Each structure stands twice: as structure tokens, then as C-alpha cells.
Amino acid sequence: MTFDYDLFVIGAGSGGLAASKRAASYGAKVAIAENDLVGGTCVIRGCVPKKLMVYGSHFPALFEDAAGYGWQVGKAELNWEHFITSIDKEVRRLSQLHISFLEKAGVELISGRATLVDNHTVEVGERKFTADKILIAVGGRPIKPELPGMEYGITSNEIFHLKTQPKHIAIIGSGYIGTEFAGIMRGLGSQVTQITRGDKILKGFDEDIRTEIQEGMTNHGIRIIPKNVVTAIEQVPEGLKISLSGEDQEPIIADVFLVATGRVPNVDGLGLENAGVDVVDSSIEGPGYSTMNAIAVNEYSQTSQPNIYAVGDVTDRLNLTPVAIGEGRAFADSEFGNNRREFSHETIATAVFSNPQASTVGLTEAEARAKLGDDAVTIYRTRFRPMYHSFTGKQERIMMKLVVDTKTDKVLGAHMVGENAAEIIQGVAIAVKMGATKKDFDATVGIHPSSAEEFVTMR
């Protein structure tokens, strides 16, 4: 049987782009379908615009810090329209850049929403295409709980397009998305209230990270309301009235309500049932992400239909952009490059671009103790005020932590809260991934004076 394409990719996000270009480099005839801007969640409504907002949110604090170093800085004022417009322009520039990369790689871009007709046929609009192999890389989307007035809430998709800066933003959700935007909006000058079901934010992260970030956020003026859930949202003359579950908790009045309670795989209307593609049982809990309708795959990203594959957030393995890229490239290498290989999901570094920032790689203390036993784990921890703040008058702190296997001396995890955490942990992650021991860390000469040197001087 002959096909229109060797590979048809549904979704031009990080995973789909990486897989399509890699497959084309091996000589495969490849098409990719996208019904939005090319680039996916990361480029269009995730990592990239969010990080630009993070950068923008740092300037008020920098202006304050400058005074401690003798600089005289005038009154700072944010031009919100300029800020948001600049972010949108950069997003669109990057989207066009990815289109040019596809053209250079020889991948055909088809605009429109793709659905599966059967295991070898995809329909886009009124056109049908056949392919030997199909890759699903449609990512995920935010989900809102079903509560009265939830239509007044926005998600992380819409926050990048607010016409005016909120005076007061209320955020429901204490995962990395809600926590990051709490820091961003507070840094930009908005009043921020974050509502969390548990007693702490960032469930699943190391306990010291959770404690340190929550304390730092509170010190920065963010109001965190623990052990509460939103019960209703109502539009009132003053803005949005947000009712909470706590008996003694007064309703919150805010002008913007951000819903950051989770994401789900974006498979609605994809036609999985037409192609015999199975999904994961929704009773299985994923890592901070709903597994409802996540596509089930094996170690080679192969679905229940042997010629159909899936990568990225739609599979709910580890929902990070570099992971989707790695999965996509591993798939292409295996199926078109004569290099069958798995993508390892072990020991992957990640960051929370909150304020204060956090980054982590490897096992948390709780995970290590559960795996090896309480007596088999040694913890090294330090907490200090960085030199930068010698003149600022601020009580900012950095926390660093190593989780070590007592018997083998192997470093199982590294965690950090504080300025430049992501940049520092990226380097530390190489050592942890390679199996470095605490003795290896101790034998490394630190760069002085730096915050990073504390990772090799902890005793």
C-alpha cells in the first residue's frame, strides 16, 4: 500500500516540530498539521511569554536595589500596553521562525485542525491524507473546575492578553503555573492573593523547597490562603467576588481571577476511537497533571495502534518542553534513523520561575527515604543571604540542599531556592545525571565569590 506521507504529525508544538524535522533529515516525507500559531504551548502561551513576563517583573526590585549601591533612580512606571504588545510580537516572531525551520527541513505545513479517520488516514478540513506512520503531539490545555461563575475566570492562555494591568489578581491553584504567575504579577505591582487547597504550595516538590518559596512569597507581599477552595465567583460592582470554603474566610474582591488548577491532554475531537488508540485509565494519578484521556504509550512512544505514536504532554509522562523534544527525536531516530532507542525520563532537571525562584533535579528527600529507608539517606543543607543583598537592606535568602545515599555516597538529588537557581541547577544536573558522589562534589573547587560554590562546600 502506498501513502501520501511516510509520517504525518498532528500538532506543531515542541514535540511535533522536533520529531518532524528529525524524521525529514533521514529522508522521510513528512507533513505536520497545526490549527494555531506554530510553536505550541511553550512558544505561544507558555514558557517563552511567561519567562519574558518574569524578566519584566524583576525591574521594580532592581530599581530599589540600585539605591543601596548609590544609584539615584527616578520614579518607575510600567507601560502595560507596551509590555504586553512586545511579548506578543516576540511570540509571533518565534512562530514564524519555526515555520522557516520546517521549510528548510522539507516538512510540509498544513494549516487546520487534524482528526483521525482511521489508523492511516488524517482529515484536515475537507482534505484527507494518508501516512505510513502518524505521530500525535497535540499537547494539553488548561481545565477549569465546574463551579458557579467560573466563566469569569481566565487561564494561563488568556493572561498574556490582558488589556490592562490588574490592581488585584486572585489565583486558584498552587502548582508551578499558579505560583509563577503569583510572583510575576506581584513583581509587576499588582496585589496578589493565592488560594491553595493544601497547607503549602507546590505539592510534589521537596518539602524544603515548598517551605522556602512560600515564606519568600509571603515576604514579597503575596497573600497565600491555605486549606481553602473556591466555591463560587460572582460579578459585583467592585469586580469579582470570590467565595471560599473556610468558615471564617471572608470573600475576596479582585478584578482578575486566574484559574490554575490543572491541565488535561488535548484530545477532544481528535478521533482516537476511529483509529483504535487507547487512553490511560483516568483513575491513575499523574505528576501534577490530569491523566484523564492521556494517550497510553510504551517506552518507544508507541500507542495501542502499532503505526501511531504520541509524544509530549498528551501522554502525561513528564510534562516539560525539553522532554517533549527528547521524546520526539527519540521516536524519529527509532522509526526513521535506524537507531532504536528509548528516551530516559530519569533525573530530569526542572525549575519554578517563581519569586523566589526554585530548581531541582533528582529525588526529593521524601522520595529518597521512601526508596532507601530513613537511615540510608544523608541530607546536606545550607541557607544564607547572598552577597548581592549586602547593600539592599533586603532579607532575601538562598537555600541549597543535597540528598545523598549514605551507603554509596551517590548524590540522589539537588535542590535550590533563590536567585539564579535554574542556571545553577542546570550545571549541577550534569553531575547528578552522571552519578557523581558527595566526595566528587567536595573535590571540586568552587568559584569564589559565588552562590553556586556552596554546592561544593557543604559539609
Curated annotation (Swiss-Prot):
EC number: 1.8.1.7
Cysteines engaged in disulfide bonds, as pairs: 42-47
Cofactor, free-text remark: Binds 1 FAD per subunit.
Example of a GO biological process term: cell redox homeostasis
Subcellular location: Cytoplasm
InterPro entries: FAD/NAD-bd_sf (IPR036188), FAD/NAD-binding_dom (IPR023753), FAD/NAD-linked_Rdtase_dimer_sf (IPR016156), GSHR (IPR006324), GSHR/TRXR-like (IPR046952), Pyr_nuc-diS_OxRdtase (IPR001100), Pyr_nucl-diS_OxRdtase_dimer (IPR004099), Pyr_OxRdtase_I_AS (IPR012999)
Entry binding sites for NADP(+): 177, 180, 197, 203, 262, 351
Keyword Manganese annotated: no
Annotated positions binding glutathione: 14, 329
Enzyme class: oxidoreductase
Cofactor dependence: FAD
Active-site residues, as the UniProt record annotates them: 448 (proton acceptor)
Cellular-component GO terms for this entry: cytosol
Alphabetic keyword roster: Cytoplasm, Disulfide bond, FAD, Flavoprotein, NADP, Oxidoreductase, Redox-active center
Source species, domain of life: Bacteria
Task performed by this protein: Catalyzes the reduction of glutathione disulfide (GSSG) to reduced glutathione (GSH). Constitutes the major mechanism to maintain a high GSH:GSSG ratio in the cytosol.
Subunit structure of this chain's protein: Homodimer.
Sequence similarity: Belongs to the class-I pyridine nucleotide-disulfide oxidoreductase family.
Listed name of the protein: Glutathione reductase
